[in-house]
A protein has these predicted regions:
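A glycosyltransferase accessory/donor-loop signature
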Residues: 1-4, 8, 14-20, 37, ...
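Short, charged/polar "capping" segments at the starts of alpha-helices
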Residues: 15-16, 41-48, 141-142
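Short, acidic, metal-binding catalytic loop of nucleotide-sugar glycosyltransferases
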Residues: 24-32
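Short internal beta-strands
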Residues: 34-41, 133-135
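Short, polar loop motifs at secondary-structure junctions
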Residues: 39-45, 115-119, 231-233
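Active-site-proximal specificity loops/subdomain of glycosyltransferases
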Residues: 46-100
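Charged, glycine/proline-rich intrinsically disordered loops and linkers
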Residues: 62-84, 142-168
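GT-A fold catalytic core of metal-dependent nucleotide-sugar glycosyltransferases
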Residues: 88-146, 183
Length: 272
């Protein structure tokens, strides 16, 4: 039997959002298995831990001093400044720590992402020797949804380094979105947290922080990414960033997972 764990990571600012996602998992998601919650700057309440059957995990904070020194205090000229203001996003790389080799598969969800149907529709996907994640360009595939728009061009030497190490073709390719993913832990033998952190400090031009590095290593270097199917086997959309991405009317009931839903509030419980 395949051993699977769901993983979330949160700081105190996103704690309530994380709990919403976990409650979704336990109720509408029908997940009775293991959930690991990585906490950053607080300790999880024992009552919550017991009530939701959570394993709390802590890792040493990823050192970002070298990264910040290379980026500079003002950040990139073409970004929303998350590279200097949303540094906890890099802590998501802990989800590729060798600690997770005790499971066969790891399913990661961002704090606040809504689980709107049974997780079986995610877990029935074949992720053997792969990482599955949404295509950032889906469903509309606009011309600006390719990798060249994910990086800063402020440092010409850094851009040249990426082209030299990964080829120029990657700039025109689609890339994974990393608010949720499912991976086979065998890929940690190819690329794990240590390599990702090394790349973080080497390729310091990613406007989307850890998402850019995950694409460079899992997708472009090691060819491990496979995109989610648009529809799950139940006929619903497997994942969407927001219902408004579709030109036709949909509601949360048409999806299995949504990052930022507008037809259901964070405090609402999905009732199918």
């Amino acid at each position: 039997m395949t051993k699977t764990v769901f993983v979330l990571i949160t700081d105190w600012a996103y704690y309530n959002k994380a709990i919403t996602t976990i409650r979704d998992l336990r109720t509408v998601g029908c997940w009775n298995g293991e959930i690991v919650l990585i906490t950053i700057d607080f300790n999880l309440d024992e009552n919550i831990k017991n009530d939701l059957k959570l394993t709390e995990m802590k890792f040493p904070s990823i050192n970002k001093s070298n990264l910040l020194e290379k980026i500079g205090p003002n950040g990139f000229s073409n970004s929303d400044k998350r590279e200097i203001h949303k540094l906890n996003q890099w802590e998501k790389l802990h989800v590729f720590d060798d600690y997770f080799l005790k499971w066969d598969r790891v399913a990661y969800l961002d704090a606040g992402l809504r689980v709107l149907d049974n997780v079986q529709y995610l877990l029935e996907l074949d992720c053997q020797n792969k990482i599955l994640a949404p295509n950032d360009a889906s469903p509309n595939f606009r011309p600006d949804q390719i990798f060249k728009y994910q990086i800063s061009y402020d440092n010409e030497e850094m851009v040249h380094l990426v082209k030299s190490d990964f080829g120029v073709d990657i700039f025109e390719k689609h890339h994974m979105l990393n608010c949720m993913w499912l991976y086979d832990t065998s890929i940690l033998k190819i690329c794990n947290k240590e390599q990702l952190i090394e790349a973080m400090n080497k390729y310091t031009l990613c406007k989307t922080n850890e998402m850019g590095i995950m694409n460079l290593l899992f997708h472009f270097k090691n060819n491990l990414w496979e995109e989610f199917p648009l529809k799950a086997s139940n006929g619903k959309y497997l994942f969407e960033w927001c219902e408004l991405n579709h030109s036709h009317h949909t509601t949360w009931r048409d999806y299995c997972f949504i990052k930022y839903p507008v037809t259901i509030r964070l405090e609402d419980r999905p009732l199918l």
